[in-house]
Amino acid sequence: MDIQKQIVDILAEATGEDFSDNMDQELYESGIMDSMTTVQMLLTLQETFDITVPVSEFNRDDWNTPNKLVEQVKKLQDEE
C-alpha cells in the first residue's frame, strides 16, 4: 500500500472523513482536526511508518493538508 493511501486511511480513522479526492483540504482551519486528533494521528503515523515526529518541531502549517502529511512522512523516512 502506498503512503498516500495509508495516510488517507489514517485520517479517515481519526476524523471520520475521506480525503482521497481532496488531498489539499485544510485540516485545522476547517475544524476537521484539533489537538486531540493531531496527537492520535501523529502516534499512528509514527507507528505505521516507523518514523519519529518530534513534538517540539511540529508546525501545524507543515502538516495541515493530506498532501503535506505525505510530504512530511516521506521527508522523515528519508532522514531515518
Swiss-Prot record:
Signal peptide: none annotated. InterPro entries: ACP-like_sf, DltC, PP-bd_ACP. SUPFAM superfamilies: ACP-like (SSF47336). Residues 1-77 form the Carrier domain. GO terms for cellular component: cytoplasm. 4'-phosphopantetheine is transferred from CoA to a specific serine of apo-DCP. One of its GO terms (biological process) is lipoteichoic acid biosynthetic process. Pathway: Cell wall biogenesis; lipoteichoic acid biosynthesis. Keywords: Cell wall biogenesis/degradation, Cytoplasm, Phosphopantetheine, Phosphoprotein. It is found in: Cytoplasm. Coiled coil: none annotated. The keyword Protein biosynthesis does not apply. Pfam families: PP-binding (PF00550). The keyword Nucleus does not apply. One of its GO terms (molecular function) is D-alanyl carrier activity. Its main location: cytoplasm. Carrier protein involved in the D-alanylation of lipoteichoic acid (LTA). The loading of thioester-linked D-alanine onto DltC is catalyzed by D-alanine--D-alanyl carrier protein ligase DltA. The DltC-carried D-alanyl group is further transferred to cell membrane phosphatidylglycerol (PG) by forming an ester bond, probably catalyzed by DltD. D-alanylation of LTA plays an important role in modulating the properties of the cell wall in Gram-positive bacteria, influencing the net charge of the cell wall. NCBIfam families: dltC, PRK05087.1. This is D-alanyl carrier protein. It comes from Lactobacillus delbrueckii subsp. bulgaricus (strain ATCC 11842 / DSM 20081 / BCRC 10696 / JCM 1002 / NBRC 13953 / NCIMB 11778 / NCTC 12712 / WDCM 00102 / Lb 14).
